[in-house]
Amino acid sequence: LKCHKLVPPVWKTCPEGKNLCYKMFMVSTSTVPVKRGCIDVCPKNSALVKYVCCSTDKCN
């Protein structure tokens, strides 16, 4: 699986076990992603951040 890093079109190949791409938003400004990459479990939302995840190449 290949996921974008913070700024597309830069991307990396995910390590084994982290088979979801994610983009993370601050809940207060949920339009601009603050972080992108590979993740193992999703969703991992909290009071401050929201994760949007997917399981296909470069979909974040």
From Swiss-Prot:
Subcellular location: Secreted; Target cell membrane
One Gene Ontology cellular component: membrane
Tissue specificity remark: Expressed by the venom gland.
Keyword field: Cardiotoxin, Cytolysis, Disulfide bond, Membrane, Secreted, Target cell membrane, Target membrane, Toxin
Similarity-based family: Belongs to the three-finger toxin family. Short-chain subfamily. Type IA cytotoxin sub-subfamily.
Function: Shows cytolytic activity on many different cells by forming pore in lipid membranes. In vivo, increases heart rate or kills the animal by cardiac arrest. In addition, it binds to heparin with high affinity, interacts with Kv channel-interacting protein 1 (KCNIP1) in a calcium-independent manner, and binds to integrin alpha-V/beta-3 (ITGAV/ITGB3) with moderate affinity.
Subunit structure: Monomer in solution; Homodimer and oligomer in the presence of negatively charged lipids forming a pore with a size ranging between 20 and 30 Angstroms.
Name the record gives this protein: Cytotoxin 1
Organism encoding this protein: Naja annulifera
